[in-house]
Amino acid sequence: MAFIGIDHGTTAMRFALIEGESTHTFELERAEAAAMSENEILTSLEEHFGIRRETINLIALTYSMGDGFSTIKDVRNLEGRGLKSIEGAGKKTGGGTRVFDAIRHSGVPAIAIPGLHTESKVDPRMKVFSHLTSPEKLGIAYHILCLGYNNFVVSDISSNTVTLAIADRKVIGAIDACIFAPGVHHGPLDLQAIRDVDNGYRTANKAFMEAGALKMTPYKDRDELLLAAEDEESPALLALDTISLFAAMEIASMQLLLKDYETIGEVFLAGSVGEFEYVQKKIRAHLGQECQCLGKWHAAIGCAEIARDVFAGEKEILGVEVNYP
């Protein structure tokens, strides 16, 4: 049996294969995927995993915001690609679209995982915001659930920061990248950003993509920032201190939500910044509790686990209804 999960990440498309007791991973940069044909993407998947597409039992796919549907369903039953609009918060490269279309047209059985939004089954108070999280974060949460945790908060900290709360195996709320805690590149629009948008200096999406902690530094990207932090350069440490503080605040807010469900839970950190030791120590100190860490592959692995369990007949994943087959 072979099950594949696909994480539509900010910088790369990550793939995970679960075959028996073995798990394998690889990634394609989004720009690299955009330059490939659909068949080249499928061939790359076959070559990296050493399998033939005809032997894949089910693929679980994530794409962009996933805000046009609210149940896990056959990818071929989606309207368009499952989005209300292609416009929104984030950079467009075409890589995710190319991978989505390659899977959709491949003939391989595939399901699409939705994001969380106002049509989702979450705490109704969270619906003050139109969108809570993109679909790949459900992959991270499901992987944690598969590790044996039923109540937890997970914060994915990288280019942006998104935090989810899970109570009794169901996701009850999340805080999206454009709402509160900044990541390296992305963050919420503050007063000056709103003025800039209103004055036509930049679009709201551009303002979102430039609202992260990187703007406090002379560095050009996440890799340069983390290298500078390893060298203990003060601008880099200030940026990571900022990210850590706001991520801890976001985690604490999700813990308050868990209390309303009469539970407390473990805290997990994910993402390329969340797994950075300096950030982990800062967040632990802010929260006064231990935090477990996940690597960058766990969204894709969790999606593969969703594919495996849906294939086995599971009708609900993290409280999200399964409408397949």
Swiss-Prot record:
SUPFAM superfamilies: Actin-like ATPase domain (SSF53067). Disulfide bonds: none annotated. InterPro entries: ATPase_NBD, Methan_mark_12. This is UPF0285 protein Mbar_A0208. Belongs to the UPF0285 family. It comes from Methanosarcina barkeri (strain Fusaro / DSM 804).
